[in-house]
Amino acid sequence: MKTIAIVGRPNVGKSLLFNRLCGKEISLVYDQPGVTRDRIVCCIKKEGKEIVLVDTGGLVFDCQTDLAKSLFDQISMAVEEAHHILFVVDGRTGLLPLDKQIAKFLREKHKAVTVVVNKLDHPGMEHFCAEFANLGFEEIFAVSAAHNLGINQLLEKIFSLGAEERENPIFAPSTRIAVIGQPNAGKSSLINSLIGESRLVVHEEPGTTHDAVEVGIEVCGVPFTFIDTAGLKKKNKLQEGLEIKVSGRTVHSINRSHLVWFIIDGQKGITLQDKKIGGLIQKAFKPCMVILNKIDLLEDRLNLKEGNKKGMLYVQEQLPFLSYAPVVVVSAEKKWNFKTLLSTLLRVDQERKKRIPTHRLTQFFQETLNQYPPPQVQGKRLKIYYATQIYDKEGSGGSPCPTFILFVNNPNCIKETYQKFLEKQFRQAFCFRGCPLLWKWRKAEGKGESSLHQDVILSR
């Protein structure tokens, strides 16, 4: 599979160009240098052919901080792995000394290079490309990523580089996992440790990740896509427009995921902000795993079995609304307890896709009501005629979580306390570990005295 890396100095429009070429907004775009930090990957297709595009951060050579060095290393790896380079420059500012440094860097890597002169926002500005011939590369394209000018011609060039024709897509459908938590909880470190390479920038400075970066791995032959997100900060700390946009993309990643990994700094413990993040997961009705990271830094060392048990009790006490979520204690740095982590992931993924036949559901609820009759409400007792599970082929249940419709005599006859009892009995029978359950109580046609036109939805 041909890989093309988009490279250039900061703020020349690489991420906007990447989004244009991919046909959707993947990389975060903001008018500030240094927004992109990790390598962002997208597979683009045309007439059955595929090419992988890689967006990179702004390339600079004066790496005075550890974070800057990490960013440089990420870009260097992207260049090494690429078959071809799109070298993006800014047509409005013209040729700068840093552009010449980058050109020298790319020549030393012995890579095929196409120069893309961006920000030529009006037809007829192609003459601005002339000075970039001094970079020493033969192919030069004039584009405006902002106004979609020259993009089709550039795509033609990209697919002429030898895109592969594939019967099966390179990125097979997979379970999408949003990896969320506070800044510096160890989200990127955990993903890097799982895949065995420094795919994501890791630094002690909170807020290193800006984009929601997707990384694919297989676990026992099952494909998963991890979405590494920016750490969610307190609202009063979202002072800049960029941080607000980053936070919004993180919430969006939760909504489009199938499952959430909630990473908590085990050394700091669960904070008020962690509880607010847990509330976002609950509100989104997402299957979830809670992962207590950095257990290698705890003074009170626990063996892993004891740690998992104590971690579960601690999370249930602090985050009772996520009581359905399994808890795993890990060390991303030391790669501790990864076997339990991945086996739990496989189990939760299976549970979220579980299907219970209508006849079994109906039998369960009718037997439970006969054995444990519900309390009367205004002289009426709840009756469940039959129950069914909603689902679609994708496996999300037509909903973020397993969803059930119960056809009853009167939805108003169900008390919340009795529903909690029913759910406890239900989980003992069918489990659904790691999954919230969504219940829709619907009046059966021709049953009962009143007619309700909407479902009564109670969920946990």
Swiss-Prot record:
<feature type="domain" description="EngA-type G 1">
    <location>
        <begin position="2"/>
        <end position="166"/>
    </location>
</feature>
<feature type="domain" description="EngA-type G 2">
    <location>
        <begin position="175"/>
        <end position="353"/>
    </location>
</feature>
<feature type="binding site">
    <location>
        <begin position="228"/>
        <end position="232"/>
    </location>
    <ligand>
        <name>GTP 2</name>
    </ligand>
</feature>
<dbReference type="InterPro" id="IPR006073">
    <property type="entry name" value="GTP-bd"/>
</dbReference>
<feature type="domain" description="KH-like">
    <location>
        <begin position="354"/>
        <end position="446"/>
    </location>
</feature>
<dbReference type="GO" id="GO:0042254">
    <property type="term" value="P:ribosome biogenesis"/>
</dbReference>
<comment type="similarity">
    <text>Belongs to the TRAFAC class TrmE-Era-EngA-EngB-Septin-like GTPase superfamily. EngA (Der) GTPase family.</text>
</comment>
<dbReference type="Pfam" id="PF14714">
    <property type="entry name" value="KH_dom-like"/>
</dbReference>
<dbReference type="InterPro" id="IPR032859">
    <property type="entry name" value="KH_dom-like"/>
</dbReference>
<dbReference type="InterPro" id="IPR016484">
    <property type="entry name" value="GTPase_Der"/>
</dbReference>
<feature type="binding site">
    <location>
        <begin position="118"/>
        <end position="121"/>
    </location>
    <ligand>
        <name>GTP 1</name>
    </ligand>
</feature>
<protein>
    <recommendedName>
        <fullName>GTPase Der</fullName>
    </recommendedName>
</protein>
<dbReference type="InterPro" id="IPR015946">
    <property type="entry name" value="KH_dom-like_a/b"/>
</dbReference>
<feature type="binding site">
    <location>
        <begin position="8"/>
        <end position="15"/>
    </location>
    <ligand>
        <name>GTP 1</name>
    </ligand>
</feature>
<keyword id="KW-0342">GTP-binding</keyword>
<dbReference type="InterPro" id="IPR027417">
    <property type="entry name" value="P-loop_NTPase"/>
</dbReference>
<dbReference type="InterPro" id="IPR005225">
    <property type="entry name" value="Small_GTP-bd"/>
</dbReference>
<keyword id="KW-0677">Repeat</keyword>
<dbReference type="GO" id="GO:0005525">
    <property type="term" value="F:GTP binding"/>
</dbReference>
<dbReference type="InterPro" id="IPR031166">
    <property type="entry name" value="G_ENGA"/>
</dbReference>
<dbReference type="Pfam" id="PF01926">
    <property type="entry name" value="MMR_HSR1"/>
</dbReference>
<keyword id="KW-0547">Nucleotide-binding</keyword>
<feature type="binding site">
    <location>
        <begin position="181"/>
        <end position="188"/>
    </location>
    <ligand>
        <name>GTP 2</name>
    </ligand>
</feature>
<feature type="binding site">
    <location>
        <begin position="293"/>
        <end position="296"/>
    </location>
    <ligand>
        <name>GTP 2</name>
    </ligand>
</feature>
<dbReference type="GO" id="GO:0043022">
    <property type="term" value="F:ribosome binding"/>
</dbReference>
<keyword id="KW-0690">Ribosome biogenesis</keyword>
<comment type="function">
    <text>GTPase that plays an essential role in the late steps of ribosome biogenesis.</text>
</comment>
<comment type="subunit">
    <text>Associates with the 50S ribosomal subunit.</text>
</comment>
<feature type="binding site">
    <location>
        <begin position="55"/>
        <end position="59"/>
    </location>
    <ligand>
        <name>GTP 1</name>
    </ligand>
</feature>
